[in-house]
Amino acid sequence: MSPLLPTHWGASAPQNEPTLPSPSHSVSTRVGDEEKLRRSEGSDGEDRINLDSNKYDVKGMKETEDGGANKQVMVVFEQKSGKELEKPIEEGPFTQPRWRHSLPFVKPKHPPPPPPLSLDDAPVTPEVSANFFNLLFFNWISPMMALGSARPLQDADLWRMDAARGAKPLSEKLLASYAARTKKANEYNARLADPNTPLPFSRRILYSVLPHREQREKDYRKKHGKKHASLAMSLLDVFGWFFMSAGFIKVFGDTCQAVTPLVIRRLINWSANYQAAKSAGLDLPSRGPGIGAAIGLLLLLICSSLGMHHYFIRSMGTGVLSRAAIISAVYQQALQFTQKSRGQIPNGKLVNHISTDTSRIDFAAGFSHMLWTAPVQMIVIIIILIVQIGYSALPGIAFLLVMTPLQARFMKTLFMFRKKAATWTDKRAKLLQEILGGMRIVKYMAWEKPFLERIHAIRSMELKYIRLLLIFRSGMTAIAMSLPILAAILSFITYSLTSHSLEAAKIFTVITLFNLMRMPLMMWPMTLSSTADALNALGRLEAVFDAELVKEEKKVDPSMDVAIRLENASFTWDSAPIEEDNMMSKLTGKYAKVLNGGKPGGPPGKKEKKNKPKKVTAAEEIQAETAAGQPGAGEASAEGQGQKNPSAPGIDEEISEKKEVEIFQLRDINLNIPKGSLTAIVGAIGSGKSSLLQGLMGEMRRTTGSVTFSGSTSLCAQTPWIQNATVRENILFGQPWDEERYWAAIRDSSLEADLELLEDGDGTEIGEKGINLSGGQKQRVNIARAIYYNADIIALDDPLSALDAGVGKAIFFNAIINALSGKTRVLVTHALHLLPYVDNIIMMEDGKIGEVGTYRELKERNGAFAKLIKEFGNEELAEEKMETEEEAVESSGPTVTHDRANMMSKGSAHTLMQTEERNVGALKKGTFFDYLKAGKGVFMLPLLFFCIVVAQSFYVITSFWLVWWEETKWPQPNGFYMGIYAGLGVGLAIALFFQGFSNALINYFASVNIHHNAISRVMLAPQTFFDTTPLGRIMNRFSKDTDTIDNTLSDAMRMAISTLANIVGSVILLAIIEPYFLIAMAVVSLLYLHNAMFYRRSSREFKRIDSILRSSLYSHFSESLSGVATIRSYGETARFFEDNIHRVDIENRAYYLTIVNQRWLGLRLDFLGSLLSFSVAIIVVCSSSVSASNGGLGLSTIVSVQQAFSWLVRQIAEVENDMVGAERIMHYANELEQESPHQIEGTKPPASWPSEGTIEFKDVRMRYRPELPDVLKGLTLNVGASEKIGVVGRTGAGKSSIMVALFRMSELSHGFIKIDGVDVSKVGLNDLRSGISIIPQDPLLFSGTLRSNIDPFNTKTDAELYDTLRRSHLIGSSDSSHNSDSQNRFNLDTVIEEEGGNLSVGERSLVSLARALVRNTKVLVLDEATASVDLETDAKIQETIRQEFRDRTLLCIAHRLKTILAYDRILVMSDGQVAEFDTPENLFLSGGIFTEMCSKANISLADIKAAAALRF
């Protein structure tokens, strides 16, 4: 081994320890004047550091090779000139922080060293090489804590886990164990199903005496007797000995603790004998035995503490590693999900599994051994009690035993509440995942507030069970705290009634024993609760482990004479059942009303009363989870979807008949695709073109036959999957850098002009889902990736449809024909005019191959293909013309020569995705105040304080009452003392309940208000927030952080407050007994405070780093799962799995150190607490003024609370750590930037606004973010009522920015926009966006039904909605409702999957058109709405626009000149300004840019005049 850091840092790493890839990390620190670096030329010619030279920046540290096997740690300095220098760390002006430097009078001479340059350079944890002493006392983490005390820790500072505890080997073991257990269970179930296999002996005996034996045996074989693999047992297989040994260590610690009362008895007996001898004037006994007993007490307490903390490090360590193994295994499983599994377990649920469920398993692992050690500890204490006071202890013990079933009943109820709460948590997470992922369309449609109401409704149901959980936990805690006192009361009363006299030694030994029961009694219910939560979570996770996976890898045969061979292959899409949840029916009152979306648009007529608009129930709205669909197969959407359709006015009754779900299938596919050929797949909508491609790629279930490839594959999907990474990283996609191949791919995919426009060229960061790229740019990046990947076989799923026709033509010839020549290309396309250039054509008909051949062969056959060509012959010519038109539009400027330097990263761009906010140091000022304010602290804190004072008063008086009873302070009978003692105990129990209840209410109100405010502000945040913040980060706030404030923070605060109250009460009691105790308390308190402050500086940074790394993990998890089809088609599953493993391991560095430094602190604070107990024992031995009774009371009190001192510090730290999560979500709740008001009452426009549709832009300037340049630069134009305006211009000219400005997605920096004379900046955003409509370029749908997507808040009748479906061509225009419904795949209850995954792009565009028809506004914007659809869909959309929007004002941002020639005026944009604006005729005659466009597109004045005759 060679040290990566100096030995005094305590870190060394084996040379063969593998390093993990990670992003670069650097931190700069300015060195002071005394550490200036000097460089001078040495005699040996080597450069030396010169301390007299200019200042340098310390960039970080790295490990370098020094002559072979030896390694050396170098500090990297950067000179002002940019030159980097390296220097061994031993020679640097740094002082490695140590514990002593945290003392106020010991300061290091130099600053601490900087962090390593990257995560790769972090050393392996020194735990693996630490000696026994350092492991025993956790000294190995001290250097890290000292560094954290000296400066804020960075992620690169944190040690790597050793390879054996990496996520990869652990997840592999877990999956292997679960698979083995599943196999064993299946074998047992198979044997059990055989009637010849005898049932287990116990069942045979039981059923022989019960009626209906045969039926019982049958049920047992089919259902009750079946076994199922257990994930909990699989985890035990992986962590068996390490985890189980923790329990035995705890038993050792508990045994030491249970013996302490016997030592206390010896001390009290010695004190009583000493006092008696002193009173009688006899020789005083030697103090030696007393001091010896005090030392014995100290040693027992230290051993007990060591046992407890080493128990926790093993059990909690198991939790950390279990979480890592489960997350990695879940990710690996999810990457292999079949379509059916993805439908049953959507991404939102998976994110909830890895955030909430794994956290509950992790938490439970730390305490689960208490399920059996607590009863063992109780039994040992009970035996000692019986030995001490005989059978008088039995009533108290019996009371405890009677109360145990009550606790178990409470736990069962808690388990039920937790399960119900988790169900609603899943629903909330799923809804949030979809809404936040589609916020752009939500804002365009002004749906923020209605969706907010849905979220609040679900949250209210979730909080209903959380509230009950908090109340029950308060009750259980009060019972657990009170049980020892009430049991002691019963035992003492019995002891007194049986004619025994109370003796100090017996009293306080028994009290100490009963007090020792408090912790197991208090922890056991919590352990039961957490175990119940964990078992529930494990049960939910088992669905992931049991999910159906893609069973086989692609079959590759390089020797095959063809590229792809399909033999008798049939494929089918899976149908995922709609999730049913009876709990949804329990939404009543306002929640049901909210989820129903309010009242319908208008009351039905008298004849329509029986046919009222269907009110969408909560179950239908929220439960519309993935169902009966075929993601990825646009044409193959489910027909009917099996939903019952309500009858409606004007709709034939037969529409409402329930229809069977029709699953799309490809049948009997036999196909050979030659190597190096270009094969096109064509066919009508719904024929199975994309399905065939998905079947080839393994995304569609193959039911029969075989598919064989001759080489590697890649997929260019119709909807491109773009990662949150740079343009270059998206194109490379994990492949090695090859400069020439890379720039060739850029050129062939027509990305050169785009890279020059981007601020940082190919180093520009792309947001999630390619948010800052246009649809065409995303598709070109997608194509460039396929070209660069250099696979043998490339599947292209209609990639040209998203491109301008001119660009599409260029890419077809430059990329598909030329650059990929020699590769096997399979192209799905609707561009019929390109077919003469392909080698082979496959004609799909109704899920079968209709014809195969060359273009000429198929035309000559006069079959289906010839019919298709004949039917769309004119449109084929039109398509070629469109290409010329669009090429003219895009090339309407000077010819540009592309400079590679302009396309490369310059390293100076603004980062799109904002770095996650991280406060350094203590919690942000006001965090606790804001939390308490949210928790209604003004009212609740006084109530809580009052309950604490009352409870502690009862505690102190109850403790002293025993002393007074033993001393017979008042001449009263025993009944007097017994009655008051019992009353005090009951009063204490009641006070403790109200104390816990008050605390629970504060946490409940805080949870309600923080989440409400946070999601409200997020929903009303500007669009730039969603463009620059990863969805995974936002979801982390509303999953893990919300779970923290709902549950973890509540428990931590309750424990901290109750512990603090107990300590205060105990200190008051001890001060009354012996005031000198306060001196020892003051000294120890200073040491407590110093250790706590030393701990907190590193603890909070561990937590914050962990939170940030966890968000990164969740973001990667969500992002990669959304692109699983692309990942699998490229064969990159292993790389993404390794990336996820790396992220889990990186996060575990911070998380594991958080656990260890808690143990470091706990052990030291327990030692200080043991010293306090020792000091009380010495006071009892050495002080003559302390009576035996008071000494016994003091000893029993300090022993029972000595661990409470360390527990308090840990709980306060835990509260602070958990408050980090609250701080993060409160940042959203209080500080998140907001859009302009959505409602402005004083300037609310009339309900009919806009009624005319006039639009005026005056000197409009706009930028997307403050740090970016203007994209609109003084735009001025006027649009008349019902005028149709076509907008054209090159990419980046500002076309779409007009729409952004009109909808106020970004606010203007200058000028104004008026609609019907109303300045849009003066009206609320909701009024503005509700008054105008949009058909966006990328139509986004939400999971649910077709009804919920076009009329999500139930404002229209069924008749109106069916009429809309006809007008938007989603169903036929036949007069017969029955025919139109039965002959089309759509009805109002057709299930729509997440993001409309089971519809084609064209079908999604038609749904978007239907939305616009339902909204029926005076102003409509089409943002390149037909750019990504086929000719047939384009024709339908244009026909609907012409017929339905005659009297509407229309702004059409167009690619194709043909689509806007019939418009009233044409707006030509250039560089954010109006270049030309007039009628098509006048612009053509003006000889400007538009004339040039028309000339290049071969459009004549006659064409324009002909189009003018067709104007709206």
Curated annotation (Swiss-Prot):
GO BP terms, alphabetized: biological process involved in interaction with host
Pfam families found in the cross-reference section: ABC_membrane, ABC_tran
PROSITE patterns listed in its UniProt record: ABC_TM1F, ABC_TRANSPORTER_1, ABC_TRANSPORTER_2
Entry keyword annotation includes Flavoprotein: no
Domain ABC transmembrane type-1 residues, every copy: 246-533, 943-1217
Membrane disposition: Multi-pass membrane protein
Biased composition (Basic and acidic residues): 31-65
Chief place where the protein resides: membrane
EC number: 7.2.2.-
Residue ranges, compositional bias (Low complexity): 619-643
Functional summary from the UniProt entry: Transmembrane transporter. May play a role in the packaging or formation of extracellular vesicles (EVs), and in the export of virulence factors from EVs. Required for efficient non-lytic exocytosis from host macrophages, the process by which the yeast escapes host macrophages with both host cell and pathogen remaining viable.
Family, as annotated: Belongs to the ABC transporter superfamily. ABCC family. Conjugate transporter (TC 3.A.1.208) subfamily.
Name of the protein in its database record: ATP-dependent permease YOR1
